[in-house]
Curated annotation (Swiss-Prot):
It catalyses: indole-3-pyruvate + NADPH + O2 + H(+) = (indol-3-yl)acetate + CO2 + NADP(+) + H2O. It holds the Pfam family FMO-like. Expressed in coleoptile tips, root tips, leaf blade tips, shoot apical meristem, vasculature of stems and flowers. NADP(+) binds at residues 184-189. Its EC number is 1.14.13.168. Calli overexpressing YUCCA1 exhibit high levels of auxin, low regeneration frequency, overgrowing roots, and abnormal root morphology. Plants silencing YUCCA1 exhibit severe dwarfism, inhibition of shoot elongation and root formation and elongation. This is Indole-3-pyruvate monooxygenase YUCCA1. Belongs to the FMO family. Involved in auxin biosynthesis. Converts the indole-3-pyruvic acid (IPA) produced by the TAA family to indole-3-acetic acid (IAA). Functions downstream of TAR2 in auxin biosynthesis. Functions upstream of WOX11, a transcription factor that promotes the development of crown roots. Disulfide bonds: none annotated. Keywords: FAD, Flavoprotein, Monooxygenase, NADP, Oxidoreductase. PANTHER family: FLAVIN-BINDING MONOOXYGENASE-LIKE PROTEIN (AFU_ORTHOLOGUE AFUA_4G09220), FLAVIN-CONTAINING MONOOXYGENASE. FAD binds at residues 21-26. It comes from Oryza sativa subsp. japonica.
């Protein structure tokens, strides 16, 4: 902990909660607190809210789930929005959401450390400029996708072409006619491969492990919506069996195209490991036609391309790493107790992962997307509000006792 005098640290007590992160999770937490009359200071390291969506997502991205499953508490999406809003529409929704709730984040505020001070019963949040904010409650809302996850492949520095993470990828337009290797077969890897194909590139996609691919819609309805409805009445295993049977009827045997399915069903696997099934938006047809080539795991990179684990070598102009993101919580949060793993993932399973000790809360670490974010935000706001209200009662009692003594 910083031992400088308070005046050098520019120590400031702030009312209510400090929320770290101004993405969907942080905005939802702040809005739900504001609705209950609890103030919050929202800290955001970038220059805008929803910065990951605004700056790190590719142009063709749209929500994979229908908008009714992705809206945040207190404000639905505009009726004129399509079923699957685009990236730009989602960012506009976030802007409107913050404005409607009166949430004004402090931009350019990077948290270097947050630690609980037992002596005063509050959290000390130190910013990169030296300022220290003191608050009774700390809400961690930086999310599970704060930093790009970039694997260190052997020979990576040798590659003479362009290598980038999907956080830098915007459109396949610049890759027309080029051979591109996409490393990763999750939703991002699948969509980037599709985008490259539609812009005239020659993509190959690395599929290292088994993967569940489901149609985004079944029988004219959202696959996710069908699954959620069935789970109200049926056990996970039966719902998984239904989804896989329907997927086989609609998509065929994906295994014959290099997309082998795990033995565990898609929902059960998601619950156990956090691995999300791919919702196909057209990529599979291009794999079947051969326009997108499925390849195995990468052993190392070479000057002209890569060497695969089966010993084969292939040349590529560009390598795009669709290897996901990671949490940055371990780099700045101290005294997290039993709430986070060393990798910054919640130790506590949903729906009880939102509350820690000493006034520590989290929003958006459920591995359940925006639905989990909304659930967390509502729970956090309710819990903090109860304590905030109790504090007001205590203050009134003290005032009444003081007045009665005269």
């Amino acid at each position: 902990m910083d031992n400088k005098p308070a005046q050098e640290r520019r120590e400031t007590w702030v009312p209510g909660a400090v929320i770290v992160g101004a993405g969907p999770s942080g905005l939802a937490a702040a809005a739900c607190l504001a609705a209950r009359g609890v103030p919050a200071t929202v800290l955001e390291r970038s220059d805008s809210l929803a910065s990951t969506w605004r700056h790190r997502m590719y142009d063709r991205l749209a929500l994979h789930l229908p908008k009714r499953f992705c809206e945040l508490p207190l404000l639905p999406f505009p009726e004129e929005y399509p079923t699957y809003p685009s990236k730009d529409q989602f960012v506009a929704y976030m802007e409107a959401y913050a404005a409607a709730a009166g949430v004004a984040p402090r931009f350019g505020a990077t948290v270097e450390e947050a630690a609980f001070d037992a002596a005063v019963g509050a959290w000390r949040v130190r910013l990169d400029g030296g300022e220290v904010l003191m608050a009774r409650w700390l809400v961690v809302a930086t999310g599970e996708n704060a930093e790009p996850r970039v694997p260190d492949f052997p020979g990576m520095q040798k590659f003479a072409g362009c290598a980038m993470h999907t956080s830098e990828y915007k459109s396949g337009e610049q890759f027309a006619g080029k051979k591109v290797l996409v490393v990763g077969c999750g939703n991002s890897g699948m969509e980037v491969s599709l985008d490259l194909c539609r812009h005239g590139a020659k993509p190959s996609m690395v599929v290292r492990n088994t993967v569940h691919v489901l149609p985004r819609e079944m029988f004219g309805l959202s696959t996710f919506g069908i699954a959620m409805a069935l789970l109200r009445w049926l056990p996970v295993q039966l719902v998984d069996r239904f989804l896989l049977t329907a997927a086989h009827l609609i998509l065929g045997n994906t295994g014959q195209f290099g997309l082998r399915r795990p033995k565990t069903g898609p929902i059960e696997l998601k619950n156990l490991t956090g691995r999300t099934p791919v919702l196909d938006v057209g990529t599979l047809d291009h794999i079947k036609s051969g326009k997108i080539k499925v390849v195995g795991a990468v052993k190392e990179m070479t000057r002209q391309g890569v060497r695969f684990t089966d010993g084969k070598e292939e040349q590529f102009d560009t390598i795009i790493l669709a290897t996901g993101y990671r949490s940055n919580v371990p780099s700045w949060l101290k005294d997290a107790g039993d709430l986070f793993t060393r990798e910054g993932i919640s130790k506590v399973p949903f729906p009880n992962s939102w509350r820690g000790r000493n006034g520590l809360y989290t929003v958006g670490f459920t591995q359940r997307g925006l639905l989990g974010t909304s659930s967390d935000a509502l729970n956090v706001a309710k819990d903090i509000h109860c304590q905030w209200r109790e504090r007001d009662r205590s203050a009134i009692n003290v005032l009444e006792i003081s007045n009665s003594s005269f």
